[in-house]
Amino acid sequence: MENMDQQPHSESLPIPRLALPDAESARRTVGRWLRTEIGDALYPAEIFFVQESFAWHVSVWFSTAARPMVARLADVYLSAATGAFLGRPSRDELTQRLDQASKQE
């Protein structure tokens, strides 16, 4: 009969790794997505860890050489565990917001 009381040794259990273990990795992921979708006018600036959802919150700003961080355009959320985007605007939404911010500058 099998002994059901035995627990596996902790040494044999793999330690899961986080896809985005720190703020810098979240910034790089959002930056790469922004460059691919929009270009280099948008900058992933402020980054916060949201404990309740175990996610990174990254603020995206319109930024130029003459006027850095002109306008906040979006908030992006990424799962720290998987690296998946949990919430982000579409390319069209970002383009519209960027056009509006450019006109106001």
PLM regions: where:
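Long, terminal "pre-/pro-" and other extracytoplasmic accessory regions
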Residues: M1-E105
